[in-house]
């Protein structure tokens, strides 16, 4: 039994890490890192805005783990494309609003850096929402128009 577990371990590791090399995996990892950097900048200046970064970092990390371990295919009662789309769309809108508020206040260099990084996060989350839009991915083939009956 130990031999079969040992033999399946590299395959399991390969399956788990193969998602991190995809476009979506790199995008989610970049979102996690950017949220962490924004959290550090907000914590250095004002902690009032840091909750957005914490929540979005947790959501992105949870989805990253679910996609990486292929848990999204095992949990079928959640519509994962729509969940990911709404997560990234709401994050883009909230980061845009928060960044504008922080840049208008503009007191302190860490707030300005956090505001600019928040605008960058808006673009990143907006791009994520664009590429994960579920209706864009569904392609329908045209129905045949030739008559099936003879001449």
From Swiss-Prot:
Domain (MARVEL) spans 19-137
A cellular-component GO term for this protein: plasma membrane
**What InterPro entries does the database record attribute to this sequence?**
Marvel, MARVEL-CKLF_proteins
Q: Which residues cross the membrane?
A: 25-45, 48-68, 85-105, 112-132
Instruction: Tell me which UniProt keywords the record has, alphabetically.
Output: Membrane, Transmembrane, Transmembrane helix
Cell location: Membrane
Bilayer topology term: Multi-pass membrane protein
Any one Gene Ontology molecular-function term assigned to this protein's record: chemokine binding
Q: What is its main location?
A: membrane
Q: What does this protein do?
A: May play a role in cell differentiation in the intestinal epithelium.
Protein known as: Proteolipid protein 2
Native organism: Rattus norvegicus
């Amino acid at each position: 039994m130990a031999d079969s577990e040992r033999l399946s371990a590299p395959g399991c590791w390969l399956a788990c890490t193969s998602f991190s090399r995809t476009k979506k995996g790199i995008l989610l990892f970049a979102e996690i890192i950017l949220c962490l950097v924004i959290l550090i900048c907000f914590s250095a200046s004002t902690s009032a805005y840091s909750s957005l970064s914490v929540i979005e970092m947790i959501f992105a990390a949870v989805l990253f783990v679910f996609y990486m371990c292929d848990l999204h295919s095992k949990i079928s009662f959640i519509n994962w494309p729509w969940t990911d789309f709404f997560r990234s769309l709401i994050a883009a809108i909230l980061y845009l609003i928060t960044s504008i508020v922080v840049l208008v206040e503009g007191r302190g260099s860490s707030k300005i850096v956090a505001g600019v990084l928040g605008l960058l996060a808006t673009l990143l989350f907006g791009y994520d929402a664009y590429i994960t839009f579920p209706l864009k991915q569904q392609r329908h083939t045209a129905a045949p128009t030739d008559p099936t009956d003879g001449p």
